[in-house]
Each structure stands twice: as C-alpha cells, then as structure tokens.
Swiss-Prot record:
The gene is MYO6. It comes from Bos taurus (Bovine). ATP binds at residues 151-158. This is Unconventional myosin-VI. The lineage of its organism: Eukaryota, Metazoa, Chordata, Craniata, Vertebrata. Residues 813-842 form the IQ domain. Divided into three regions: a N-terminal motor (head) domain, followed by a neck domain consisting of a calmodulin-binding linker domain and a single IQ motif, and a C-terminal tail region with a three-helix bundle region, a SAH domain and a unique globular domain required for interaction with other proteins such as cargo-binding. Homodimer; dimerization seems to implicate the unfolding of the three-helix bundle region creating an additional calmodulin binding site, and cargo binding. Able to function as a monomer under specific conditions in vitro. Forms a complex with CFTR and DAB2 in the apical membrane of epithelial cells. Component of the DISP/DOCK7-induced septin displacement complex, at least composed of DOCK7, LRCH3 and MYO6. Residues 917-984 are annotated as: SAH.
Length: 1295
C-alpha cells in the first residue's frame, strides 16, 4: 500500500508511531509498525496520517511540512525537542516546550541583540522573535499589542513572560532606572504570588497582565501590572506535596537573625499554615549549607532540599531584597511587608477549645496565648480585642430605635477557626494588593502612545480534588480559549470569506455554551452561587442542588457519578458537579464554594483591623474601607462581596482590552508530568496541542494568510514619496506594481478585495514592504516606477504582436470558412446524387468494354455486320441509360434493374461472340474479359456489404441514443418525483447535519474528557473506569447509527472507539459514496471482518453471484474510503491524483442522496441487485478531460486528453487515458485497482452524459492500438487480472 511509504498511526503513550499500511478494513487500516515484522494492529482510518519521507528532518515552522497534520506536528516538535530546540512556529504562533533545564546562551544578551529588528522566520524560532514582532507591529500599525502566554501549569508561562519583558526593556528601553525596575518587579511578585504545586514548582497562583508603555519615539516610558484572582485558600491549607507562597519559606530561610527575633520566626514546621504541606526548602548544595540547622524542619533534614534550577529560597530572599531596593522600597517598608507576613503565620497558630459553659462559645487554648501576643504585636492590634473578635461576633438589634442594642454572640470552635482563617486571608490579600500597587508606583508614566501587554495567568488546572479556585481559573481559560478561537479561527475565516480568498473552512469546537453555563445571568453557576450567598443560611449542598436542577439537561454539566475516575464516583450529587471544559471534564467539589465566594469579614474583625494602631496596617485596608462604605452591614449580618462576579468583571475588562489590541500567542507545552528534562510524553503533549487549538490552526494555515495589509495603508505610506504620475495610480494597482518590482513570487501572496495577504513563512517579505524607513520607501518607489515603465513597454509590444496575430487569424478563418463551405456543399451534393453517380460509374465501366467487343467483331470473318449491329444496339442502350440517369432522378433500385438488363444483354452478346470466335487468341481474350467481370461482381458485393454494415452501425447508434433518451426521461421522471418530497427531505437532512455536527462536538468532548482523565489518573495514580468495561450489556443494547445522535429522544453516550469509527464515516468521499452505503440495505453476507486481500481473492474465484456482488460492493466501498483518506492527506503543492476525470468523480449525485430509502424505496435499486441484473452487460464510454494543472490556463494552451472506460456490469474492468504529450496509460481491474475509478457506473453519471457512450468496436480499436491486448495478457499470465468479460474474451481468442 502507498508504495511502502510510512504512515503515522495512534499510540497510547507516544501519541503516534510509524508503520506501513498492509490492509484496508471497512473503517480502519491494518498497520505494521516499522521494525516489527509480522506484528500488526488496527487503526481507525481518520486517525492515520502520512509521514514525512525523512523522519529525522525538522523544520522551524510547522507550516513548512510536506504533510500538515497533528502527527507530523507532534513528531516535528519531538525531533526539535531532542535537539534542545524548544521553540517552533505554527505560522505566527509560537509553541514553547518547557525544557526543565537551562539551555546555554539561549537567553543571553547577544541572543537578544541578534533578534532585534529581524522578521519572523529569518532567525530560529524564539520567544524574543515574538516580542520583537509585537514591537514592530505596534510601531508600524500604530496600535497597541498583546502577547498571550498560555498553557498548563508547569508549562513555562511565567519564565517566557519574564523573557518577553526582559527583551522589550533591554532592546527598546530608555536607558533609565525604569527599565531595570520593570524586570526587577518579577522576583517580588513571584515571592508573594507563586507557590509549589504538584505540577509546578513555581506556579503563579494569580494572573497578571503586565503593560509596557511606549512614547511616540517607541521607547519604554513605564509599566503597569494588573492582577487577578489570588488563590487565598492556599494561605491556610495546602496539599501534602505542595507549599504555601514562597515568601513564607524565604523569610524563614533567608532572614537575618535580627529580623527573625523581631518577627518571632522559627522553622516552617512550627506554623499551622505551613506544616500541613511540604516544609522543605528549595536549595542547592551551597545554599543548603548557608541555611542554619534550627531553621530546617525534620522533613528537610530527612529528605534533603527540593531541587529546581530556577528556585533557591535562601538565594531568592537575597534577590528579593535587592529587587525591593531597586524598585524604591526602603528598609522600613520592607520590614513592614515582612511583619505582616509573620503576623499571618502567628495568626494561624491560634487555637480554640470549647468554653465548657452553657453559652456554647469557645476560648483560646493556653498554648495559643503566645501566638496571640505575637500576632497582635505584629499587626498593631490590642491583644484582648483580638481575642474577643476571634471568639465572638457583634450583632446590632434595630427594634428599640435607629441605633439599636449591641449584642455579642459567642462563636463555636469551628466558627472561630473560620473567622481566624478569613482574617489571615484578608490580611494577606490586602498585602498582595499593596505589593502590586507599590510595583506600579515604581515605574510611573505621564503619557503613553501605545503599550505591549503580556498576559500570564494560571493555566488550565485539573487535580484529583478541585475547588473554587480551580473553577475560576478554568473559567478564565475558557474565556481565553474563546478569544483565541475568535481571533485566530473565526475572525480569520470571516476575513478570508469577506475578501474572497477561497480558503477552505476549518471547523472547531465552540465553547460558548460552557461559558454561558458559568456566567449567564440568573442561570449561570456564578449567579446561582451569589444568590446562595445572599440567603440567611447559605449552604454548599443547596447551591449544588440548585446548579443540577437548573441545568439537568445541559451537555456541559454532569453529576460526579458519571466521572471516568473512580475517586469521583464516591462524591454525592449535592457535593459536586462535573463541567466539560474545552480541555476535558473536571469534577469540582463544592465544599467551601459559598465561603470562598465571599470576600468580606464580619463586622467585629473588620472594625478591629481597620482601627489598628499600626499605620501600615490601616493603609492596607483604607482603600477597601472606602469602597465598602455604601455596603454597610445591617442587623449583624455578614456583608457580601462576590469573588466570582468580581473576577468575571475583571476578566471581561481584560478581554475588552485584548480585543482592542493586536494579538500574538505563545502556547507553552508541558513535556511530561514528572517535570524532568529530555522526557517527551507524546500522548499528553498531543492532548495539549489539540486542546490549545494548534491542530485547527494547522488546518487553517494550510491555505491561510497570517500577514496582511490594506491597499490604502500601503498606498498612503508611500504616497508622499511618489511623483505625480505614480500618485494617480489606483492603490490596488500600485500594490501590484510594488510586489512585481520587488520580484515576489505570486504563490507567496494573494490579493483580496481591500487587502493583500501573505502566506505563512513570508514575514520577511511582509516586513520589507511595511518598513517605514524614508530612504527605504523612496527606493521602493523608484523600483515601482522602473517596473511600470518596463511593463508598459512590454504591453505595447504584446499589443502590436496581438494585433498582427489577430489579423492573420481573421484571414485564416475567412479562408477556412470558404473551404468549409465548399466541402460541405460538395458533401451535400454527393450525398444527394450518390446513387446516380455510382450508377454512372458502373454503366461507364460497361461502356468501356464495348471497345473490346468491337475488336472481337473486327476480327470475325463471318457475321461481322450482324455482330456490329448488336454491338451498336448495346452501345445505344448504354448511352440511353446514362442519359436517363443524368436527366432524371432515379432510385438506386431502378438504376440497378436497368444496369442488370444491360449486363445480361452484354453477356448474351459475349456468348454469341464466343461461339464465333474459334481461335485460341480470341478465346483467351474472352476468358480475360470473364475474369474482369467476375472481379467487378465481387467488388459490387463488397460495396453492398460495406453499405449494409454502415447502415447497421447507424441503426445501433440511433438505438443507443434512443436508449439514452429513454434513460434521461426516466431520470427526469424520478427527479420530478423527488421534487415533490424535496422540502421534507431537505429539512430532514438539515436536522441530520445539525445532529451530526452536535454529535461531533460531543464525540470530540468525550475524547478530551477521557484523555484528561487518563492524565489525572497517571499523575494521581488513580484508576480510570472504561464505560465499555463497566456495563458492556448496556452498550450492546444501544442501536448506533452513523447519522442520528439521539436514540428515542435521549442523547447516547459513546466510547472513544465508537466515536472514532463514526468520525471515519465522514471521510467517505461526498454524497455519492454515502448514497451507495445507504442503498446497500440489509446485507446477507457480513464482510466487515474480511481482509482486503480476501475480498479480492473471492472476486477472482467465486461462482456465487450474490457473494460476488457483495464482495465487489464492499471492495469498492473500501477503495472509496481509502482514496478519500489519500485525498485528504495529500502532499502540499501537488496536483490532485486523478483516477477519472473531474466530471466523473464530482458528478452531482444529490438527487439520489436526497431520496431516503424509507421515503421513496423504489427510487433506486440496491447496488447488489443492480449488479445481478446488469451482470453481463458490457458498456463502453469516452469523455474528454483537462489536467488539473491546465484548467486555469488560456483555452488555447490547454492540453485535452481522452478517458476511456469499459464497465463490466456496474464496475469498471478496463480504463485508458490518452494524453497529448505522453504515452497512453492502460489499467485493468485487479492489477491496477488503486489507480482506477472506484465508483460504480450509476455513481459516475456516465450513462446520463450525452455522447459519452461509444461502440465496443471504437473502444477495442484504441485499446489494441495502444497495446492493450499485450498488457491484459501479461496481467492474466501473472495472475493479477481479475476475471472479467475482457479477460474471458482474450483467453478464448488466444485458444
């Protein structure tokens, strides 16, 4: 198969593996892995892709691959990753794979300089190239830019963000302190906002949008950081293998002894907010020794330090302090920050116990007194007030008047713990807000022309246990994925369609329904949660039940019992829900959803913290106090500040800002779950590529144009440098002249209605045109002027030549017309008088024989006068007949009758002469005359036979035409019948297409859900439950249908194998193939498990007509699917393989497809029944064709060929292609199945093409002339030809 070329087939861990196709199944291909002779496996046909010829080759831009598909995309990234080339392009989108080690010199200052001002594609792929492109776009297009850095946690988003900021400040900074401050702000933000998780040692637990602002000279003037959704729950509790925010550990490890004493710090295991997670420090061998032993926890001493090339708690503390100094924080402010951090740690160590009184309240434990004292000291609070506020809550009664009575309500232990944690989270959250504000204050700007924003926000998260933080993060990623879809897929395709570029449409999964599920008004999960928070006694269970009740039929929402992970099946329906995100299904446990959605403290704690003696603490809460003046607490109820809706508002503002800018994308990829270097886990990387939309982008970029410019923008850019004669040019014509002057290849760009577009990888040419340097623009204008002069002179030359050619052509045509008229007149006259002319010729021949009669008579001695008289009489009769023929209209029969009488008379006279001729010489002459007469008689008989044969052929052609007209009338009658039910059929098909589209979305989501569950299972060591194993009987009971996606009104669930099988049905080539499948009906023979070779052998040997018909039908069906696969996965920039002319393979079969078997069962016979009825009917066809490469050429330059076909019943037996400039191509069934037309006779529409059918003799003459007999004989001798009518006839002839 495929001449032994390798293909990519799916592999469970590597993503894809290379192999060869050895057999074609009903919906799958049999693959033999390379290097594993004899070992085969089945792969669904839509999951198999052709491989590059050189498997070790890598390209910088995936759009440069010969085959553009997800397998070659993955392999190219893998090959480059193995060579430590972690960056790859897909057009102008950068794919960055996290190497998990430092690659030498890749981010050096020399590397930064090498990318400055360079077009995308002229240097190896790099994050610096994207940053420089954003800067140049901002400068040329006069438009702010955004760089969206996305990817899963641990994929390298934060590091790439830092490299972008460093590049912009070092390359285009103003040379002042502000450049360093922008870069130095990162360590400070990471210290307070990043933490170790199970999937990332330096995970950003907040989102940030960093804006670098530029003045009119395109120099950096300042920056601004916006932050989103700090994960506050991490402050109080972490997972076993996770840590709190870095600042806590860095303070414990790196603070001086003086600071430690002032802040009362010790090792992390002594603090509740740290000791429930990992308490080990990040350190290398040297810095581990610098950390004092009393600062290390037992866990650290036992297991050693954590290792990461980018993290070092002791060294990072020093770097953080240096960064604080550079951005303008003095020692006092720095100590204030540390003091609040330490105060939060001590606050977490306060414990409570039951009071033991009837009031039902609680008291502080004795061992917590010290922690209470430290906390009050560090936060500037009164110790007694803090104790009271943590154990009681103040309520106001309004019954007695406007002021009411103050009542202190004691809190239970659990309520006190919650109040303590709420205070800790609030304090730290305000501290983080303050850090971000101080960072923004350190690089202020007065005026800004444009900015470049870099978005770094937490990637899609999926853990064994997911809470409100993961819900908000994944909601954010849903919105960002939608923005990516809109900007790259939707808007691009709409622009291509609007500009008339004719780019094929690329389908992608729209996640709007998932976003609506979360954020829709009243019905969205966030609004349901807010409504729950406003209830007098809110509960997580009531909230969860409300979500399920309001969205019980929503595709994107499900109950935990339907999770693919066993651990989630134990969660009750009112304790969680599953959301099917774009990247896969995530199960959320709703415990604490209500609590985490409220950002407000109860009045006692808020009053306490706002009235702190410490000025710094009061400043932290001043802004929030001012914001909340309008929402005062009433009657002792907790005020409510919605975290979810606050985040939604921030996110919408962010997206509005992104939509107003030009966008560049960096897709970060996590190569493995173990976070180790040089470990490439293909399957999970493929999943990331699919979820990030890279596969859809690859499909779009096959015919896409990522760079574009408006005609008017280009024209206006050059206008002031143009002379007057050029300024009069139309903008479109000027652009065309500009591209011609630059010598650009027409394949690399395309003109739309208002813009010019460039192919992927042609960014250097685009930048050359868009370069706004005055000298460069003036030089280009000169080249345009020179090109216009040359082109116009050439046009004058061509016009002159064309006029001369036209004159000669007119003269030639006039002469040809005269010749045609003469010829036609002659032919008409000849056809009219043909019998008389033939009669005159025959009579004239008879007259010539009179000379010989006279010679014989003159030689006679006796009876000469009498014989002369008889000869004269005969001559007179001949002359009279000739005159009669010339003067009157006689029929062929009349002429023949009189001619025969004359012949008889001449024969009588001849016999008389023979009696009188005694001499041998005279007898010899008479004998010769007799021979001549005999020859004449034979010639007349041959003429008569030829005439009858011609009449017979004319009769057969008339019968064929009559048969074609009859078939045409029958077809029209069927079409008339179909039109009566067309509206109903079209409605049904529209519903089927809609259901199929919805089903494909469901199937794609099912696949992503399963892949995500597998990844969670691998990372959490859980087992995944396969539905097929869980309930096989239930699956067997389902009636799967290739089109309908609902069974008895309910949506069905499918396994990935069934999903892929159905998706492969879509590959079948167009409506003709689907119509054949639909017409097949119920089958007597189940051939689904037969191999391709078995089908072929049965066709060659079977005598069972029904089995033979079934095998042929299945054989050709598989050929259709296989050829559809080849067509879809053909090489780029290659001509489409033609097994038959386009008019045959693209025949409009829609009328037959629209006929559903249930609605019009008599419209068409099943294929097998057709074959039985047409079993020995032989039909021959001939149609012209034009090669695809010539179809857009001038009509005079097109090279037309002829395509011949011999159909044995419904299937093709022999095929010929006659080309004008190369030898004929001969094909026979069996030997050349892969190259022949695979459609049956009805599907080709040949029987409905006027003049297409020819006589067997016409086919056989061409076949024999081209060497067809020898070719067929060699195929028979080598046992490659399939038994057909042609093989049987040839074998009989040879015998």
């Amino acid at each position: 198969m495929e001449d032994g070329r390798p293909v990519w087939a799916p592999h469970p861990t590597e993503g894809f593996q290379m192999g060869n196709i050895v057999d074609i199944g009903p919906d799958s291909l049999t693959i033999e892995p390379l290097g594993q002779k004899g070992k085969t496996f089945l792969a669904l046909i839509n999951q198999v892709f052709p491989a590059e010829e050189d498997s070790k080759k890598d390209v910088e831009d995936n759009c440069s691959l010969m085959y553009l598909n997800e397998a070659t995309l993955l392999h190219n990234i893998k090959v480059r990753y193995s060579k430590d080339r972690i960056y790859t392009y897909v057009a102008n989108i950068l794919i960055a794979v996290n190497p998990y080690f430092d690659i030498p010199k890749i981010y050096s200052s020399d590397s930064i300089k090498s990318y400055q001002g360079k077009s995308l594609g002229t240097m190896p792929p790099h994050v610096f190239a994207i940053a420089d492109k954003a800067f140049r776009d901002m400068k040329v297009l006069k438009m702010s830019q955004s760089i969206i850095v996305s990817g899963e946690s641990g994929a390298g988003k934060t590091e790439n963000t830092k490299f972008v900021l460093r590049y912009l400040t070092e390359s285009y900074g103003s040379g002042q302190d502000i450049d360093d401050r922008i870069v130095e702000a990162n360590p400070l933000l990471e210290a307070f906002g990043n933490a170790k998780t199970v999937r990332n040692n330096n995970s950003s637990r907040f989102g940030k949008f960093v804006e670098i602002h530029f003045n009119e000279k395109s120099s950096v003037v300042g920056g601004f950081v916006s932050h989103y959704l700090l994960e506050k729950s991490r402050i109080c509790v972490q997972g076993k293998e996770e840590r709190n925010y870095h600042i806590f550990y860095r303070l414990c490890a790196g603070a001086s002894e003086d600071i430690r004493e002032r802040l009362h710090l010790s090792s992390p295991d002594n603090f509740r907010y740290l000791n429930r997670g990992c308490t080990r420090y990040f350190a290398n061998k040297e810095t581990d020794k610098q950390i004092l032993q009393n600062r290390k926890t037992p866990e650290h001493l036992k297991a050693g330090s954590l290792k990461d090339p980018l993290l070092d708690d002791h060294g990072d503390f020093v770097r953080m302090c240096t960064a604080m100094k550079k951005i303008g924080l003095d020692d006092e402010e720095k100590l204030d920050l540390f003091r609040v951090v330490a105060g939060v740690l001590h606050l977490g160590n306060i414990d409570f116990e039951e009071a033991g009184s009837t009031s039902g309240g609680c008291n502080l434990k004795n061992k917590s007194t010290q922690s209470l004292e430290y906390c009050a000291e560090l936060l500037g609070l009164d110790q007694d007030d803090l104790r009271v506020s943590l154990t009681t809550r103040v309520m106001l009664t309004t019954a007695g008047g406007t002021k009411g009575t103050v009542i202190k309500v004691p809190l239970k232990v659990e309520q006190a713990n919650n109040a303590r944690d709420a205070l800790a989270k609030t304090v730290y959250s305000h501290l983080f807000d303050h850090v971000v504000n101080r960072v923004n204050q350190c690089f202020p700007f007065e005026t800004s022309s444009y900015f470049i924003g870099v978005l770094d926000i937490a990637g899609f998260e999926y853990f064994e246990h997911n809470s409100f933080e993961q819900f908000c993060i994944n909601y954010c990623n849903e919105k960002l994925q939608q923005f990516f879809n809109e900007r790259i897929l939707k808007e691009e395709q709409e622009l291509y369609q609007k500009e008339g570029l004719g780019v094929n449409e690329v389908h992608y999964v729209d996640n709007q329904d998932c976003i609506d599920l979360i954020e829709a008004k009243l019905m969205g999960i966030l609004d349901i949660l807010d409504e729950e928070n406003r209830l007098p006694q809110p509960s997580d269970q009531h909230f969860t039940s409300a979500v399920h009740q309001k969205h019980k039929d929503h595709f994107r929402l499900s109950i935990p019992r339907k999770s693919k992970l066993a651990v989630h099946r134990n969660i009750r329906d009112d304790e969680g829900f599953i959301v099917r995100h774009f990247a896969g299904a995530v199960c959320y446990e709703t415990t604490q959803f209500v609590e985490k959605n409220n950002d407000a403290l109860h009045m006692s704690l808020e009053s306490l913290i706002c009235e702190s003696r410490d000025k710094f603490i009061r400043e932290l809460f001043e802004s929030s106090t001012n914001n909340n003046k309008d929402t005062k607490q009433k009657a002792g109820k907790l005020s409510f500040i919605s975290v979810g809706n606050k985040f939604k508002t921030q996110l919408n503002l962010l997206l509005d800002k992104l939509r107003s800018t030009g966008a560049s994308f960096i897709r970060c990829i996590k190569p493995n779950l173990k976070m180790t270097s040089h470990d490439f886990e293909g399957a999970q990387i493929l999943s990331q590529l699919q979820c990030s939309g890279m596969v859809s982008v690859l499909d779009l970029m096959q015919g896409g144009f990522p760079s574009r410019a408006s005609f008017h923008e280009l024209y206006n850019m050059y206008k002031k440098y143009m002379p007057d004669k050029l300024a009069r040019l139309d903008p479109r014509l000027f652009c065309k002249a500009l591209f011609k002057a630059l010598g650009l290849n027409e394949v690399d760009y395309k003109f739309g209605l208002t813009k010019v577009f460039f192919r992927p990888g042609k960014f250097a040419e685009f930048d050359q045109i868009m370069k706004s340097d005055p000298d460069h623009l003036a030089q280009l204008v000169k080249r345009v002027n020179h090109w216009l002069i040359c082109s116009r002179w050439k046009k004058v030359q061509w016009c002159s030549l064309s006029v001369i050619k036209l004159k000669n052509k007119i003269k030639y045509r006039a002469e040809a017309c005269i010749k045609m008229q003469k010829t036609i007149r002659m032919w008409l006259c000849k056809r009219r008088h043909k019998p008389r002319i033939d009669g005159l010729v025959k009579v004239g021949t008879l007259k010539k024989r009179l000379d010989k009669f006279n010679e014989v008579v003159s030689a006679l001695k006796d009876g000469k006068a009498e014989m002369n008289k008889q000869v004269k009489d005969l001559e007179i009769s001949i002359d009279a007949l000739m005159a009669k023929i010339k003067s009157t209209m006689m029929t062929r029969e009349q002429i023949q009758k009189e001619y025969d009488a004359l012949v008889k008379s001449s024969e009588v006279l001849l016999s008389a002469l023979q009696k009188k001729k005694q001499q041998e010489e005279e007898a010899e002459r008479l004998r010769r005359i007799q021979e001549e007469m005999e020859k004449e008689r034979k010639r007349r008989e041959e003429d008569e036979q030829r005439r009858r044969k011609e009449e017979e052929e004319r009769r057969m052609k008339l019968e064929m035409e009559a048969k074609r007209k009859q078939e045409e009338e029958e077809r029209k009658k069927r079409e008339d019948d179909e039109k009566r039910i067309q509206a109903e059929v079209e409605a049904q098909l529209a519903r089927q297409r809609e259901e199929e589209s919805q089903q494909q979305a469901v199937l794609e989501q099912e696949r992503r859900d399963r892949e995500l569950a597998l990844r969670i299972a691998r990372s959490e060591a859980e087992l995944i439950i396969d539905e097929a194993q869980a309930d096989p009987a239930a699956l067997r009971s389902l009636d799967f249908h290739p089109v309908t996606s609902k069974i008895n009104g309910t949506r069905r669930t499918m396994t990935p194998e069934q999903m892929a099988k159905e998706m492969s049905e879509i590959l079948s080539r167009g409506p003709a193939v689907q119509a054949t499948k639909a017409a097949a009906g119920t089958k007597k023979h189940d051939l689904s498990k037969w191999k391709y070779a078995e089908l072929r052998d049965t066709i060659n040997t079977s005598c069972d007509i029904e089995l033979l018909a079934a095998c042929r039908e299945e054989f050709h069906r598989r050929l259709k699917v296989y050829h559809a696969w080849k067509s879809k996965n053909k090489k780029r920039n290659t001509e489409t393989e033609q097994r038959a002319p386009k008019s045959v393979t693209d025949y409009d079969f829609a009328p037959f497809l629209n006929n559903s078997p249930q609605q019009n069962p008599a419209a068409q016979l099943p294929a097998r029944q057709q074959e039985i009825e047409m079993n020995r009917q032989q039909r021959f066809f001939r149609i012209p064709f034009i090669r695809p490469a010539d179809q857009y050429k001038d009509p005079q330059n097109k090279k037309k060929g002829w395509w011949y076909a011999h159909f044995d019943g419904p299937w093709i037996a022999r095929q010929m292609e006659l080309h004008p400039d190369k030898p004929p191509i001969l094909l026979v069934a069996g030997k050349d199945d892969m190259e022949m037309c695979e459609l049956n006779l009805e599907e080709t529409g040949l029987t409905r093409k006027r003049g297409a059918e020819i006589l067997p003799r016409q086919f056989e003459e061409i076949w024999e002339r081209c060497g067809g007999i020898q070719y067929l004989q060699s195929a028979i001798e080598s046992r490659q030809a399939r038994p057909t009518y042609a093989t049987a006839m040839l074998q009989n002839l040879l015998k």
